[in-house]
Amino acid sequence: MMDFGFVDSLKGASKRGKNAVIAEVKVRSPIHGDLLRGRRIEDILRAYEKAGAAAISYITAEQFSGNFETLKKIVGLTDLPVLRKDFIRGRKEVERTAEVEAAALLLIARHLKERTAEMVDFCFEHGIEPLVEVHHAEDLVYAENARAVLINNRDIDRMERDGGSIDVTAKIAEKIRAFKVSGSGIGSVEDLLFVLQYVDAALIGTAFMMAENTEEFVQTVCGGEKMIEDVLRGLDFDKAYELAKTLPELDEIKIAAVLAALEAKGYGAEVIAGFAKGVAEKSKIEIGKVMDTCGTGGDKTSSINVSTAVAIALSTVHPVAKHGNRAVSSKSGSADVLEALGVRIEMDEERARKMIAETNFAFLFAPLYHKSFARVAAVRRNLGIRTIFNVTGPLTNPARPEVQIVGVASEILLVEVAKAMSLLGRRAVVVYGSGMDEVNPNSSTDIAVVNGGVERLKLEPEDFGIERCRVLPCSSSGESAERIRAVFSGKGLKEDRRLIAINFATALFALGYEDLKENVEIFEEKVQSGELARKLEEIACKSTSM
Protein backbone atom coordinates (compact mmCIF):
# COMPACT_ATOMS: atom_id res chain seq x y z
CA MET A 1 0.00 0.00 0.00
CA MET A 2 1.33 3.44 -0.89
CA ASP A 3 2.35 6.02 1.70
CA PHE A 4 0.04 8.99 1.12
CA GLY A 5 1.45 11.38 3.75
CA PHE A 6 -1.78 12.28 5.56
CA VAL A 7 -1.55 9.67 8.31
CA ASP A 8 2.23 9.99 8.44
CA SER A 9 1.96 13.73 9.09
CA LEU A 10 -0.27 13.01 12.07
CA LYS A 11 2.08 10.31 13.32
CA GLY A 12 4.99 12.71 12.92
CA ALA A 13 3.33 15.27 15.20
CA SER A 14 3.04 12.66 17.94
CA LYS A 15 6.68 11.66 17.54
CA ARG A 16 7.68 15.31 18.02
CA GLY A 17 5.79 15.39 21.31
CA LYS A 18 2.83 17.35 19.94
CA ASN A 19 -0.85 16.52 19.91
CA ALA A 20 -1.78 15.26 16.43
CA VAL A 21 -4.54 17.64 15.35
CA ILE A 22 -6.35 18.17 12.04
CA ALA A 23 -7.47 21.81 12.00
CA GLU A 24 -10.62 22.44 9.98
CA VAL A 25 -11.30 25.51 7.87
CA LYS A 26 -15.05 25.87 8.30
CA VAL A 27 -17.01 28.70 6.72
CA ARG A 28 -20.42 28.11 8.28
CA SER A 29 -22.11 26.00 10.95
CA PRO A 30 -25.83 25.08 10.93
CA ILE A 31 -25.96 26.02 14.61
CA HIS A 32 -23.49 28.92 14.94
CA GLY A 33 -23.87 30.48 11.50
CA ASP A 34 -20.97 32.42 9.95
CA LEU A 35 -17.65 31.24 11.37
CA LEU A 36 -15.30 33.37 9.29
CA ARG A 37 -16.50 36.58 10.99
CA GLY A 38 -14.93 38.77 8.33
CA ARG A 39 -11.62 36.91 8.27
CA ARG A 40 -9.99 35.60 5.12
CA ILE A 41 -9.49 31.87 4.68
CA GLU A 42 -5.82 32.60 4.01
CA ASP A 43 -5.51 34.15 7.48
CA ILE A 44 -7.14 31.14 9.15
CA LEU A 45 -4.85 28.82 7.23
CA ARG A 46 -1.73 30.77 8.24
CA ALA A 47 -2.83 30.72 11.88
CA TYR A 48 -3.28 26.94 11.75
CA GLU A 49 0.14 26.43 10.18
CA LYS A 50 1.92 28.75 12.58
CA ALA A 51 0.24 27.21 15.61
CA GLY A 52 1.35 23.67 14.77
CA ALA A 53 -1.58 21.85 13.14
CA ALA A 54 -0.51 18.53 11.59
CA ALA A 55 -3.07 18.62 8.76
CA ILE A 56 -5.89 20.76 7.33
CA SER A 57 -9.51 19.83 6.71
CA TYR A 58 -12.02 21.67 4.51
CA ILE A 59 -15.73 20.97 4.01
CA THR A 60 -16.83 21.42 0.40
CA ALA A 61 -20.51 20.64 1.13
CA GLU A 62 -22.95 23.44 0.26
CA GLN A 63 -24.70 23.08 3.64
CA PHE A 64 -21.52 24.49 5.20
CA SER A 65 -21.05 27.18 2.51
CA GLY A 66 -18.14 25.20 1.08
CA ASN A 67 -17.15 24.78 -2.56
CA PHE A 68 -14.62 22.96 -4.68
CA GLU A 69 -12.79 26.09 -5.87
CA THR A 70 -11.88 26.99 -2.29
CA LEU A 71 -10.56 23.46 -1.76
CA LYS A 72 -8.23 23.95 -4.75
CA LYS A 73 -7.12 27.28 -3.32
CA ILE A 74 -6.35 25.80 0.12
CA VAL A 75 -4.35 22.91 -1.35
CA GLY A 76 -2.28 25.43 -3.28
CA LEU A 77 -1.68 27.64 -0.26
CA THR A 78 -0.37 25.09 2.23
CA ASP A 79 2.28 22.40 2.43
CA LEU A 80 0.23 20.55 5.04
CA PRO A 81 -1.82 17.56 3.83
CA VAL A 82 -5.43 18.56 3.16
CA LEU A 83 -8.50 16.43 3.91
CA ARG A 84 -11.62 17.02 1.83
CA LYS A 85 -14.88 16.49 3.72
CA ASP A 86 -18.19 16.10 1.88
CA PHE A 87 -21.07 13.68 1.44
CA ILE A 88 -19.21 11.60 -1.15
CA ARG A 89 -21.44 9.21 -3.13
CA GLY A 90 -19.47 8.13 -6.20
CA ARG A 91 -16.15 7.65 -7.96
CA LYS A 92 -16.34 10.95 -9.83
CA GLU A 93 -15.80 12.88 -6.58
CA VAL A 94 -12.73 10.78 -5.83
CA GLU A 95 -11.31 11.66 -9.25
CA ARG A 96 -12.05 15.38 -8.74
CA THR A 97 -10.34 15.26 -5.35
CA ALA A 98 -7.27 13.60 -6.88
CA GLU A 99 -7.08 16.26 -9.60
CA VAL A 100 -6.53 19.05 -7.05
CA GLU A 101 -4.04 16.89 -5.13
CA ALA A 102 -5.90 16.83 -1.83
CA ALA A 103 -4.19 14.25 0.39
CA ALA A 104 -7.25 12.61 1.91
CA LEU A 105 -10.98 12.20 1.40
CA LEU A 106 -13.74 11.50 3.91
CA LEU A 107 -15.96 8.50 3.19
CA ILE A 108 -19.05 8.16 5.39
CA ALA A 109 -19.67 4.47 6.09
CA ARG A 110 -23.31 4.99 7.04
CA HIS A 111 -24.06 6.49 3.62
CA LEU A 112 -21.91 4.23 1.45
CA LYS A 113 -22.56 1.02 3.41
CA GLU A 114 -21.40 -2.01 1.35
CA ARG A 115 -19.81 0.32 -1.24
CA THR A 116 -17.38 1.70 1.37
CA ALA A 117 -14.74 -1.00 0.74
CA GLU A 118 -14.67 -0.44 -3.04
CA MET A 119 -14.49 3.34 -2.54
CA VAL A 120 -11.56 2.86 -0.15
CA ASP A 121 -9.73 0.86 -2.81
CA PHE A 122 -10.62 3.43 -5.49
CA CYS A 123 -9.13 6.20 -3.34
CA PHE A 124 -5.92 4.23 -2.92
CA GLU A 125 -5.73 3.72 -6.68
CA HIS A 126 -5.84 7.50 -7.12
CA GLY A 127 -3.21 8.27 -4.47
CA ILE A 128 -5.71 9.55 -1.91
CA GLU A 129 -5.90 8.52 1.76
CA PRO A 130 -9.51 7.46 2.50
CA LEU A 131 -10.64 8.44 5.99
CA VAL A 132 -13.68 6.30 6.76
CA GLU A 133 -16.18 7.92 9.13
CA VAL A 134 -18.13 5.86 11.66
CA HIS A 135 -20.54 6.83 14.43
CA HIS A 136 -21.81 3.48 15.72
CA ALA A 137 -19.92 0.25 16.28
CA GLU A 138 -22.17 -1.29 13.61
CA ASP A 139 -20.57 1.01 11.01
CA LEU A 140 -17.19 -0.66 11.50
CA VAL A 141 -18.09 -3.65 9.35
CA TYR A 142 -17.83 -1.34 6.33
CA ALA A 143 -14.37 -0.02 7.29
CA GLU A 144 -12.39 -3.24 7.40
CA ASN A 145 -9.94 -2.29 4.62
CA ALA A 146 -9.45 1.32 5.80
CA ARG A 147 -6.04 2.45 6.98
CA ALA A 148 -7.58 5.36 8.91
CA VAL A 149 -10.96 5.71 10.63
CA LEU A 150 -12.68 8.87 11.88
CA ILE A 151 -15.03 8.47 14.85
CA ASN A 152 -17.68 11.17 14.47
CA ASN A 153 -18.98 12.03 17.93
CA ARG A 154 -22.13 13.48 16.34
CA ASP A 155 -24.86 11.68 14.43
CA ILE A 156 -24.21 12.78 10.83
CA ASP A 157 -27.87 12.33 9.84
CA ARG A 158 -28.83 15.08 12.30
CA MET A 159 -26.17 17.42 10.93
CA GLU A 160 -24.72 19.57 13.71
CA ARG A 161 -27.96 19.80 15.63
CA ASP A 162 -26.71 16.80 17.54
CA GLY A 163 -24.37 18.38 20.11
CA GLY A 164 -22.25 15.26 20.10
CA SER A 165 -20.55 13.43 22.93
CA ILE A 166 -16.88 12.56 23.16
CA ASP A 167 -18.00 9.46 25.06
CA VAL A 168 -18.77 8.00 21.62
CA THR A 169 -15.02 7.86 21.00
CA ALA A 170 -14.42 6.10 24.30
CA LYS A 171 -17.07 3.48 23.53
CA ILE A 172 -15.94 2.30 20.11
CA ALA A 173 -12.25 3.20 19.76
CA GLU A 174 -11.01 -0.10 21.17
CA LYS A 175 -12.85 -1.97 18.42
CA ILE A 176 -10.81 -0.19 15.72
CA ARG A 177 -7.44 -1.55 14.63
CA ALA A 178 -6.71 1.16 12.04
CA PHE A 179 -5.25 4.62 12.72
CA LYS A 180 -7.95 6.35 14.79
CA VAL A 181 -9.14 9.96 14.62
CA SER A 182 -11.84 11.54 16.81
CA GLY A 183 -13.91 14.43 15.45
CA SER A 184 -16.82 16.71 16.46
CA GLY A 185 -17.72 17.94 19.92
CA ILE A 186 -14.10 18.61 20.92
CA GLY A 187 -14.27 22.11 22.35
CA SER A 188 -11.46 22.37 24.89
CA VAL A 189 -8.02 21.10 25.83
CA GLU A 190 -9.70 18.84 28.39
CA ASP A 191 -11.89 17.31 25.65
CA LEU A 192 -8.83 16.77 23.48
CA LEU A 193 -6.86 15.08 26.24
CA PHE A 194 -9.86 12.85 26.95
CA VAL A 195 -10.18 11.58 23.38
CA LEU A 196 -6.42 11.19 22.95
CA GLN A 197 -6.56 8.49 25.58
CA TYR A 198 -8.39 6.38 22.98
CA VAL A 199 -7.32 7.63 19.54
CA ASP A 200 -4.21 8.73 17.64
CA ALA A 201 -5.38 12.14 16.44
CA ALA A 202 -8.26 14.60 16.63
CA LEU A 203 -10.13 16.76 14.12
CA ILE A 204 -11.28 20.14 15.44
CA GLY A 205 -13.17 22.80 13.51
CA THR A 206 -15.91 24.84 15.17
CA ALA A 207 -14.01 25.38 18.44
CA PHE A 208 -10.99 26.71 16.54
CA MET A 209 -13.06 28.93 14.26
CA MET A 210 -15.05 30.39 17.18
CA ALA A 211 -12.06 31.04 19.45
CA GLU A 212 -11.46 34.68 20.37
CA ASN A 213 -7.82 34.25 19.38
CA THR A 214 -7.72 31.33 16.96
CA GLU A 215 -3.94 31.09 16.65
CA GLU A 216 -3.37 31.19 20.41
CA PHE A 217 -6.02 28.55 21.09
CA VAL A 218 -4.77 26.26 18.33
CA GLN A 219 -1.23 26.64 19.62
CA THR A 220 -2.35 25.66 23.12
CA VAL A 221 -4.21 22.63 21.75
CA CYS A 222 -1.79 21.48 19.04
CA GLY A 223 1.42 22.51 20.67
CA GLY A 224 -0.02 22.12 24.18
CA GLU A 225 2.25 19.28 23.82
CA LYS A 226 1.74 15.70 24.58
CA MET A 227 3.46 16.40 27.87
CA ILE A 228 0.20 17.89 29.24
CA GLU A 229 -1.52 14.65 28.31
CA ASP A 230 1.30 12.73 30.01
CA VAL A 231 0.97 14.88 33.14
CA LEU A 232 -2.75 14.20 33.43
CA ARG A 233 -2.24 10.49 32.85
CA GLY A 234 0.52 10.38 35.46
CA LEU A 235 4.30 10.71 35.36
CA ASP A 236 7.03 8.42 36.64
CA PHE A 237 10.60 9.41 37.65
CA ASP A 238 11.99 9.35 34.10
CA LYS A 239 9.10 11.30 32.54
CA ALA A 240 9.24 13.91 35.31
CA TYR A 241 12.99 14.23 34.74
CA GLU A 242 12.49 14.77 30.98
CA LEU A 243 9.63 17.19 31.63
CA ALA A 244 11.83 19.37 33.84
CA LYS A 245 14.58 19.47 31.21
CA THR A 246 12.11 20.29 28.41
CA LEU A 247 10.06 22.92 30.26
CA PRO A 248 12.40 25.91 29.62
CA GLU A 249 12.15 25.30 25.87
CA LEU A 250 8.37 25.86 25.79
CA ASP A 251 6.61 29.18 25.34
CA GLU A 252 4.87 30.89 28.25
CA ILE A 253 1.39 29.56 27.44
CA LYS A 254 2.57 25.97 27.41
CA ILE A 255 4.67 26.39 30.55
CA ALA A 256 1.62 27.73 32.39
CA ALA A 257 -0.52 24.87 31.07
CA VAL A 258 2.00 22.23 32.19
CA LEU A 259 2.43 23.75 35.66
CA ALA A 260 -1.34 24.06 36.11
CA ALA A 261 -1.85 20.48 34.93
CA LEU A 262 0.74 19.26 37.45
CA GLU A 263 -1.05 21.03 40.28
CA ALA A 264 -4.41 19.64 39.15
CA LYS A 265 -3.07 16.10 38.92
CA GLY A 266 -0.87 16.19 42.02
CA TYR A 267 2.47 14.45 42.37
CA GLY A 268 4.25 11.96 44.58
CA ALA A 269 7.82 11.06 45.48
CA GLU A 270 8.86 9.76 42.06
CA VAL A 271 7.68 12.87 40.24
CA ILE A 272 9.21 15.21 42.85
CA ALA A 273 12.55 13.38 42.68
CA GLY A 274 12.64 13.13 38.89
CA PHE A 275 11.62 16.75 38.40
CA ALA A 276 14.18 17.96 40.96
CA LYS A 277 16.94 16.01 39.26
CA GLY A 278 16.03 17.54 35.88
CA VAL A 279 16.06 21.09 37.28
CA ALA A 280 19.30 20.67 39.22
CA GLU A 281 21.28 18.94 36.51
CA LYS A 282 22.68 22.09 34.89
CA SER A 283 23.47 24.04 38.04
CA LYS A 284 26.02 22.07 40.06
CA ILE A 285 28.75 24.09 41.79
CA GLU A 286 31.66 23.14 44.04
CA ILE A 287 31.95 25.16 47.26
CA GLY A 288 32.75 22.42 49.75
CA LYS A 289 30.68 20.44 52.24
CA VAL A 290 27.70 22.53 53.30
CA MET A 291 24.26 22.30 54.88
CA ASP A 292 21.00 23.96 53.81
CA THR A 293 17.83 24.94 55.68
CA CYS A 294 14.87 25.51 53.43
CA GLY A 295 11.09 25.29 53.51
CA THR A 296 8.62 24.72 50.71
CA GLY A 297 6.37 27.48 52.07
CA GLY A 298 2.63 27.43 51.66
CA ASP A 299 1.73 27.01 55.32
CA LYS A 300 -0.40 30.20 55.44
CA THR A 301 0.98 31.21 58.89
CA SER A 302 2.86 34.24 57.48
CA SER A 303 5.54 33.86 60.16
CA ILE A 304 8.98 35.45 60.08
CA ASN A 305 11.56 33.82 57.78
CA VAL A 306 12.54 31.06 60.21
CA SER A 307 14.71 28.93 57.92
CA THR A 308 16.75 31.98 56.89
CA ALA A 309 17.31 32.99 60.53
CA VAL A 310 18.31 29.41 61.36
CA ALA A 311 20.71 29.31 58.39
CA ILE A 312 22.54 32.40 59.68
CA ALA A 313 22.66 31.06 63.25
CA LEU A 314 23.76 27.63 62.05
CA SER A 315 26.74 29.13 60.21
CA THR A 316 28.36 29.64 63.63
CA VAL A 317 28.56 25.84 63.82
CA HIS A 318 28.74 24.49 60.26
CA PRO A 319 29.10 25.87 56.69
CA VAL A 320 25.69 26.78 55.23
CA ALA A 321 24.76 27.37 51.58
CA LYS A 322 21.25 28.78 51.76
CA HIS A 323 19.36 28.22 48.50
CA GLY A 324 16.37 30.50 47.96
CA ASN A 325 14.39 33.01 45.97
CA ARG A 326 12.14 36.02 46.25
CA ALA A 327 8.56 35.49 47.32
CA VAL A 328 6.23 34.12 44.64
CA SER A 329 3.03 33.32 46.53
CA SER A 330 4.02 34.51 50.05
CA LYS A 331 4.81 37.89 51.64
CA SER A 332 8.54 37.36 52.13
CA GLY A 333 11.04 35.02 50.51
CA SER A 334 14.53 34.24 51.79
CA ALA A 335 16.08 36.61 49.23
CA ASP A 336 13.74 39.41 50.31
CA VAL A 337 14.55 39.13 54.03
CA LEU A 338 18.31 38.75 53.47
CA GLU A 339 18.27 41.88 51.34
CA ALA A 340 16.39 43.67 54.13
CA LEU A 341 19.11 42.46 56.54
CA GLY A 342 21.75 44.10 54.35
CA VAL A 343 23.07 40.90 52.77
CA ARG A 344 24.01 40.89 49.09
CA ILE A 345 21.88 38.17 47.51
CA GLU A 346 23.59 37.85 44.12
CA MET A 347 26.71 35.77 44.66
CA ASP A 348 28.25 33.84 41.78
CA GLU A 349 30.14 30.60 42.43
CA GLU A 350 33.44 32.37 43.13
CA ARG A 351 31.88 34.81 45.62
CA ALA A 352 29.89 32.00 47.24
CA ARG A 353 33.08 29.98 47.70
CA LYS A 354 34.81 32.98 49.31
CA MET A 355 31.82 33.65 51.55
CA ILE A 356 31.86 30.05 52.77
CA ALA A 357 35.60 30.26 53.42
CA GLU A 358 35.40 33.58 55.29
CA THR A 359 31.98 33.50 57.00
CA ASN A 360 30.69 29.91 56.78
CA PHE A 361 27.61 31.31 54.96
CA ALA A 362 26.62 31.86 51.34
CA PHE A 363 23.31 32.61 49.71
CA LEU A 364 22.62 30.90 46.39
CA PHE A 365 20.00 33.04 44.65
CA ALA A 366 17.96 30.57 42.59
CA PRO A 367 17.51 32.75 39.44
CA LEU A 368 21.29 33.21 39.25
CA TYR A 369 21.97 29.48 39.32
CA HIS A 370 19.00 28.29 37.28
CA LYS A 371 19.21 30.79 34.40
CA SER A 372 17.72 28.37 31.89
CA PHE A 373 14.49 28.56 33.91
CA ALA A 374 14.19 32.36 33.68
CA ARG A 375 11.08 32.20 31.48
CA VAL A 376 9.55 29.61 33.78
CA ALA A 377 10.15 31.94 36.73
CA ALA A 378 8.34 34.76 34.93
CA VAL A 379 5.36 32.49 34.29
CA ARG A 380 5.30 31.45 37.95
CA ARG A 381 5.21 35.10 39.02
CA ASN A 382 2.32 35.81 36.66
CA LEU A 383 0.43 32.72 37.76
CA GLY A 384 0.78 33.74 41.41
CA ILE A 385 0.09 30.21 42.64
CA ARG A 386 2.22 27.51 44.22
CA THR A 387 3.74 25.07 41.76
CA ILE A 388 5.97 22.01 41.84
CA PHE A 389 8.95 24.39 41.94
CA ASN A 390 8.01 25.34 45.52
CA VAL A 391 8.25 21.69 46.50
CA THR A 392 11.40 20.87 44.54
CA GLY A 393 13.22 24.11 45.42
CA PRO A 394 14.91 22.64 48.52
CA LEU A 395 16.01 19.63 46.45
CA THR A 396 17.71 21.69 43.73
CA ASN A 397 20.43 23.46 45.71
CA PRO A 398 23.37 23.67 43.26
CA ALA A 399 25.87 23.13 46.11
CA ARG A 400 24.48 19.61 46.71
CA PRO A 401 24.38 19.92 50.54
CA GLU A 402 25.60 16.92 52.52
CA VAL A 403 22.63 17.33 54.86
CA GLN A 404 19.44 19.43 54.78
CA ILE A 405 16.53 20.58 56.88
CA VAL A 406 13.42 20.77 54.69
CA GLY A 407 10.13 22.16 55.94
CA VAL A 408 6.87 21.15 54.25
CA ALA A 409 3.30 22.39 54.65
CA SER A 410 1.38 19.10 54.86
CA GLU A 411 1.76 15.59 56.22
CA ILE A 412 1.32 14.20 52.70
CA LEU A 413 4.26 16.28 51.50
CA LEU A 414 6.30 15.17 54.52
CA VAL A 415 6.03 11.58 53.35
CA GLU A 416 6.50 12.28 49.64
CA VAL A 417 9.40 14.74 49.98
CA ALA A 418 11.18 12.38 52.39
CA LYS A 419 10.77 9.51 49.93
CA ALA A 420 11.94 11.75 47.09
CA MET A 421 15.08 12.73 48.98
CA SER A 422 15.72 9.07 49.72
CA LEU A 423 15.36 8.25 46.01
CA LEU A 424 17.96 10.93 45.27
CA GLY A 425 20.32 9.52 47.89
CA ARG A 426 20.12 12.62 50.11
CA ARG A 427 20.57 12.94 53.89
CA ALA A 428 17.93 15.17 55.45
CA VAL A 429 15.41 15.88 58.17
CA VAL A 430 11.99 16.79 56.76
CA VAL A 431 9.63 18.59 59.16
CA TYR A 432 5.90 19.33 59.27
CA GLY A 433 4.70 21.27 62.30
CA SER A 434 0.92 20.89 62.47
CA GLY A 435 0.14 23.33 59.69
CA MET A 436 3.61 24.91 59.51
CA ASP A 437 6.59 24.15 57.30
CA GLU A 438 8.72 24.63 60.42
CA VAL A 439 8.98 23.01 63.86
CA ASN A 440 5.89 24.26 65.71
CA PRO A 441 6.37 25.85 69.18
CA ASN A 442 2.69 25.43 70.01
CA SER A 443 1.85 21.93 68.75
CA SER A 444 3.20 18.59 67.55
CA THR A 445 5.80 18.37 64.80
CA ASP A 446 6.20 15.31 62.59
CA ILE A 447 9.68 14.71 61.25
CA ALA A 448 11.10 12.23 58.78
CA VAL A 449 14.79 11.42 59.12
CA VAL A 450 16.24 10.49 55.72
CA ASN A 451 19.52 8.61 55.84
CA GLY A 452 19.40 5.61 53.53
CA GLY A 453 15.85 4.85 54.64
CA VAL A 454 13.12 7.04 56.14
CA GLU A 455 12.38 7.08 59.89
CA ARG A 456 9.32 8.90 61.27
CA LEU A 457 9.37 10.71 64.64
CA LYS A 458 6.98 13.05 66.48
CA LEU A 459 8.22 15.97 68.56
CA GLU A 460 6.44 18.17 71.11
CA PRO A 461 7.56 21.64 72.28
CA GLU A 462 8.35 20.09 75.67
CA ASP A 463 11.01 17.91 74.02
CA PHE A 464 12.97 21.12 73.49
CA GLY A 465 12.49 22.28 77.08
CA ILE A 466 10.37 25.31 76.15
CA GLU A 467 6.92 26.50 77.09
CA ARG A 468 4.39 26.42 74.31
CA CYS A 469 3.72 29.72 72.59
CA ARG A 470 1.81 30.97 69.58
CA VAL A 471 3.37 31.87 66.24
CA LEU A 472 3.16 35.59 65.53
CA PRO A 473 2.22 36.70 62.00
CA CYS A 474 4.54 38.87 59.93
CA SER A 475 3.42 41.32 57.24
CA SER A 476 6.57 41.99 55.21
CA SER A 477 10.22 41.15 54.61
CA GLY A 478 11.20 44.39 56.35
CA GLU A 479 9.31 43.43 59.49
CA SER A 480 10.75 39.91 59.35
CA ALA A 481 14.29 41.32 59.13
CA GLU A 482 13.74 43.66 62.10
CA ARG A 483 12.38 40.86 64.27
CA ILE A 484 15.21 38.45 63.36
CA ARG A 485 17.79 41.15 64.10
CA ALA A 486 16.08 41.80 67.44
CA VAL A 487 16.20 38.11 68.41
CA PHE A 488 19.90 37.88 67.50
CA SER A 489 20.54 40.97 69.65
CA GLY A 490 18.77 39.43 72.64
CA LYS A 491 15.92 41.94 72.50
CA GLY A 492 13.35 40.13 70.40
CA LEU A 493 9.88 38.84 71.18
CA LYS A 494 9.91 35.62 73.22
CA GLU A 495 7.64 33.95 70.63
CA ASP A 496 10.09 34.67 67.80
CA ARG A 497 13.03 33.59 69.94
CA ARG A 498 11.49 30.23 70.82
CA LEU A 499 10.42 29.63 67.23
CA ILE A 500 13.95 30.19 65.91
CA ALA A 501 15.53 28.30 68.83
CA ILE A 502 13.65 25.03 68.34
CA ASN A 503 14.23 25.08 64.58
CA PHE A 504 17.94 25.76 65.18
CA ALA A 505 17.94 22.83 67.62
CA THR A 506 16.41 20.57 64.96
CA ALA A 507 19.04 21.65 62.44
CA LEU A 508 21.74 20.66 64.93
CA PHE A 509 19.90 17.35 65.37
CA ALA A 510 20.29 16.76 61.63
CA LEU A 511 24.04 17.31 62.07
CA GLY A 512 24.21 14.67 64.80
CA TYR A 513 23.58 16.76 67.93
CA GLU A 514 20.92 14.47 69.36
CA ASP A 515 19.96 16.27 72.61
CA LEU A 516 17.30 18.81 71.59
CA LYS A 517 17.27 20.59 74.97
CA GLU A 518 21.03 21.07 74.86
CA ASN A 519 20.69 22.35 71.30
CA VAL A 520 18.27 25.05 72.50
CA GLU A 521 20.75 25.99 75.23
CA ILE A 522 23.47 26.33 72.58
CA PHE A 523 21.24 28.79 70.73
CA GLU A 524 20.56 30.80 73.90
CA GLU A 525 24.27 30.99 74.69
CA LYS A 526 24.98 32.30 71.20
CA VAL A 527 22.28 34.97 71.59
CA GLN A 528 23.46 36.07 75.03
CA SER A 529 27.12 36.20 74.02
CA GLY A 530 26.30 38.39 71.02
CA GLU A 531 27.72 35.78 68.63
CA LEU A 532 24.61 35.72 66.42
CA ALA A 533 24.43 39.51 66.12
CA ARG A 534 28.13 39.59 65.19
CA LYS A 535 27.68 36.77 62.67
CA LEU A 536 24.83 38.62 60.93
CA GLU A 537 26.93 41.79 60.76
CA GLU A 538 29.90 39.83 59.40
CA ILE A 539 27.82 38.18 56.66
CA ALA A 540 26.27 41.50 55.61
CA CYS A 541 29.62 43.33 55.52
CA LYS A 542 31.55 40.60 53.70
CA SER A 543 28.82 40.05 51.10
CA THR A 544 28.64 43.73 50.15
CA SER A 545 32.41 44.33 50.14
CA MET A 546 33.34 41.47 47.78
Curated annotation (Swiss-Prot):
Positions that bind anthranilate 2: 380
Q: What pathway annotation does it carry?
A: Amino-acid biosynthesis; L-tryptophan biosynthesis; L-tryptophan from chorismate: step 2/5; Amino-acid biosynthesis; L-tryptophan biosynthesis; L-tryptophan from chorismate: step 4/5
Q: Does the keyword Glycosyltransferase apply?
A: yes
Q: Does the keyword Lyase apply?
A: yes
Which amino acid positions bind 5-phospho-alpha-D-ribose 1-diphosphate, per UniProt? 295, 298-299, 303, 305-308, 322-330, 334
List GO BP terms, alphabetically.
Answer: L-tryptophan biosynthetic process
**What's a Gene Ontology MF term here?**
indole-3-glycerol-phosphate synthase activity
| Indole-3-glycerol phosphate synthase: region residues | 1-226
Q: How is the cofactor bound?
A: Binds 2 magnesium ions per monomer.
Binding residues for Mg(2+) 2 = 437-438
Q: Which Pfam families match?
A: Glycos_transf_3 (PF00591), IGPS (PF00218)
Region span, Anthranilate phosphoribosyltransferase: 227-546
Q: What EC number is given for this enzyme?
A: 4.1.1.48, 2.4.2.18
Which SUPFAM superfamilies does this chain map to? Answer: Nucleoside phosphorylase/phosphoribosyltransferase catalytic domain, Ribulose-phoshate binding barrel
Which positions does UniProt annotate for Mg(2+) 1 binding?
Answer: 307, 438
What chemistry does it catalyse, as a reaction equation?
Answer: 1-(2-carboxyphenylamino)-1-deoxy-D-ribulose 5-phosphate + H(+) = (1S,2R)-1-C-(indol-3-yl)glycerol 3-phosphate + CO2 + H2O; N-(5-phospho-beta-D-ribosyl)anthranilate + diphosphate = 5-phospho-alpha-D-ribose 1-diphosphate + anthranilate
Cellular component per GO, a single term: cytosol
User: Which cofactors does this gene product need?
Assistant: Mg(2+)
Ligand binding (anthranilate 1): 295, 325
Keywords (A to Z) from UniProt: Amino-acid biosynthesis, Aromatic amino acid biosynthesis, Decarboxylase, Glycosyltransferase, Lyase, Magnesium, Metal-binding, Multifunctional enzyme, Transferase, Tryptophan biosynthesis
Recorded hits in CDD domains, A to Z, give: IGPS
NCBIfam families given in the database record: trpD
Functionally, this protein is described as follows: Bifunctional enzyme that catalyzes the second and fourth steps of tryptophan biosynthetic pathway. The second step is catalyzed by the anthranilate phosphoribosyltransferase, coded by the TrpD domain and the fourth step is catalyzed by indole-3-glycerol phosphate synthase, coded by the TrpC domain.
Concerning its family, UniProt says: In the N-terminal section; belongs to the TrpC family.
Protein name, UniProt field: Tryptophan biosynthesis protein TrpCD
The record lists the organism as Archaeoglobus fulgidus (strain ATCC 49558 / DSM 4304 / JCM 9628 / NBRC 100126 / VC-16)
